[in-house]
């Protein structure tokens, strides 16, 4: 049975991860755990699950956006992507939009902020079959406005999971 499972998962699918951990901000309060969390997650994804990992530690706005575009542009229809972000987040109350704050961001200079909408747009544009986004930051809930109330959901059965594996998904 184990050989059957191993054979089933040996496909042309590739697994990519963009892992970002920002602790050391130029103009904002420094964080304690974001960088270490990113290192641990990148290590597990690479060494336990075989992901090709791009790890960005204390990345500025240009590096973060350029890497996001580079990865999402190269993905093919059977590829899978995990994006993990740990760092500061902020809400622009006037626009009611959330942002990731790279290490060169400041509250006075919003041009360095990365809009959650930019992240969502890149996820929508990529050809990857499956994309999972995990954001450990303030205002990460603004990434997906159509959030589902999981408390009222029926339990997920295996047939549903099998159907999802064959569809393009974004979580």
Which residue stretches match the model-derived regions?
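Short helix-loop-beta junction
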Residues: 36-52
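A generic structural signal for short coil/turn motifs at secondary-structure boundaries
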Residues: 26-30, 54, 108-110
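Compositionally biased, proline/threonine/alanine/serine-rich low-complexity intrinsically disordered stretches
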Residues: 1-9
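Glycine- and acidic-residue-enriched helix-capping/strand-helix junction motifs
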Residues: 24-39
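Active-site-proximal C-terminal subdomain of hydrolase catalytic domains
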Residues: 45, 131-171
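Caspase-like (clan CD) cysteine peptidase catalytic core
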Residues: 7-8, 14, 52, 59-86, ...
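Acidic/histidine-rich, surface-exposed loop or edge segments in extracytoplasmic proteins
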Residues: 17-26, 46-51
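Conserved beta-strand scaffold positions in the cores of enzyme catalytic domains, especially
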Residues: 17-19, 53-56, 161-163, 169-171
